[in-house]
Structure formats: structure tokens, C-alpha cells
Amino acid sequence: MGSINNYISENNHVEIIGIPTTDEGLPVRDCIRALRSRGLLRLFVEGGGDTVTRFFNGGTLDRLQISVAPTVFGSGRPGLRLPPTPTAQEAFRPKQCSHFQLGDDILFDFELEKVWPSK
């Protein structure tokens, strides 16, 4: 796989922002700060378990959408990994939850704004 520069030309009006990675991967808060400094106020992130977990655990999401399909894959990487919760009072609870039927699938839409436990 080549460099991203092979796929994006200057004619696309694209700015490539370099964010140094850490041992844990891409620091999502640094990504958000870099985008906000350029005037971007909303960001749609679509990804698998690692990406969603990184943004969720980083406290950078204000909305989370998870679709559930009637398909059994067996063992594998979980869709969302969270640290253990010692008590029910400390459990994560979305501000609002809606669900939508999409054929045989169900989409859960969680509003996360201002629901993070205080530390």
C-alpha cells in the first residue's frame, strides 16, 4: 500500500495533518484538537472495534450508533471494549437512546453528551 500522497492530489483541496502516534496508536484527542484548530466542529467517525473503542474511551464522542444484525460470527474481536465498572452507579448510561429497524438489522443511537462519570 502506498503513501496517502499517492491518492490525494493538491487539486482536491485536501490538507494532510500529521499526528504522531503513540504506543497505544493514534491519539484521538490530538486529532480532534488539530481538526478544531482548523474550524471543523463536527466529525463522523466510522470504524470497527478498535476505532470505536479508542474514540469512546477517549471521551470524544457525543453520539454512538451501533447496528446489530442477525448474524453469528463466532469468536473474534469485540465491537466495543470498555474498562471494568466496579458498581452499577458507575456504569455508563447514555443521555438518550433510540433504536431504528433497518430491515432485519436494528440501529441503536446513543446520545452521549454530558454522561461521562465525574472523576
Task: Enumerate the language-model features and the residues they cover.
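Enzymes that bind and transform nitrogen-containing heteroaromatic metabolites
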Residues: 1-119
